[in-house]
Amino acid sequence: MSNYCDRRINMLIKQVMEVFDLLDSAYVSGGEVKNYLQNKGDADITVKTIQDGTHSTDFIKIVISGKNGKTAGGSAPTLGIVGRLGGIGARPEVTGYVSDGDGALCALAVAAKLIEMKTKGDVLEGDVIVCTQLCPHAPTQPHEPVPFMGSPVDMATMNREEVDEAMEAILSIDTTKGNSIINVNGFAISQTVKEGYILRYSSDILDVMQRTTGKAPHTFGVSMQDITPYGNGVYHVNSILQPATATGAPVIGVAVTTEQPVAGCATGASHFVDVEETARFAMEVAKAFTAGKCSFYDQAEFHLLEKKYGKMSHLQTMGADI
């Protein structure tokens, strides 16, 4: 193993491997993942199956309560971690776990680690809510050389099930490899998006990224199109910022990336080093944010923008009929 791997495969690699073994199955269900997490320790876990024609998906929500979190009657901030994807598999067109599943893999690995930490006495100050979906038989769109990934549910349903009103800030983790915009193996973060405004990069989040990777932070820019809802007829790089259309909380996209474009339905394209690094970053953000030591945006500056230029929340809607 190279020095690169020796230095970076640590903290969450066990959880990543365990979760991957669960997800890499044509028969995996939300109930199976729930049982796995419950065996780790205390957490409030709910699973909801939604059927759409011949396809279905299991949405899973994990609430890991903090010692001073809202669920305990406290006042510490609540972080949301959303694992975004169309599906973890594209069967029968493609055999096995697909690259698009890395958002779920990251989010569930973080949940497993936080539950284990709590069992061992390391309890975060505030609550963490982890949401994702599991669909091993996601629909695809015919395309050469490989089919595109689809989803058994529409974006409105996905947002309704994965964006919880208790989330006071959200990390949206999504495989973002099928483009020529981000050209690095690992992960990259977006600017903060809040109520139609694309704000500057959070210096606190950049600091966490530098500390956990030991490297200069990688970022990617988002467009106005990316922060509008799916289905409005304009181009979106992917669904990574779609949670921002369904909440007033600040959202940061966390993109799992590669140097070269890779299709979401590609198999054998998930890199454990990159997934672990992304998950570890999200866990450290959870520690800092729920302790009140990490901000996603400058509140005073945001209010100044709204006073000077007005609200931009219309960008969270489908827009005018034309």
Which residue stretches match the model-derived regions?
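Solvent-exposed alpha-helices and their adjacent loops that cap or buttress functional pockets
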Residues: 53-55, 68-75, 98-100, 120-124, ...
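Active-site-adjacent substrate-binding region
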Residues: 176-320
